[in-house]
Amino acid sequence: PGAEHIYIGFPNRYVQERHPVASHAYPGVNDALFMASRDGVTWTRYLEAWVRPGLDQRNWTERNNYPIWGLMETAETEWSLLISEHYRQPDAPCRWRRLSLRPHGFVALHGEHAGGTCTTKPFTFGGRDLRLNFSTSAAGSVQVALLREDGAPIPGFGTADMPPLYGDQLDAPVAWSGGD
């Protein structure tokens, strides 16, 4: 929702050699990954699990944690994804669980206490306002600098020219003392 130029997917990963619930008759455990593409041909697949089995031991068996339906916008500030759980469990029926997600928060930087930097590939900004979707801890923050091709900040648009942003916002404007 809201970024139709980006394709996303949630492939399931099956690890057959793991059998964490010995009483379950079948080997293997599943989780789900996240992948994205801008053209539908070249994909980036993130190998860290995006949907994990969690604390419920009945989900640490094969054929669980499958995303069932595509991403759904369930509120202005929430997206939802349905996954399967309790597959082939003698004491519980198979069911769907709804996961609640932050809009556009799949691949994100974190404004952590220790700080850090991230430099994007060069791009031409064609808009009027630069806006961020971010979430920080109480001690963390986010700042943005506009850089020249040589990596130096454009005067008036460096991190020293803007107050740190902190909090939790889905569409926050970025402003520098050198202009907007």
Regions found by a protein language model. Name each.
Residues P1-D180:
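Carbohydrate-active catalytic/glycan-binding domains of CAZyme proteins
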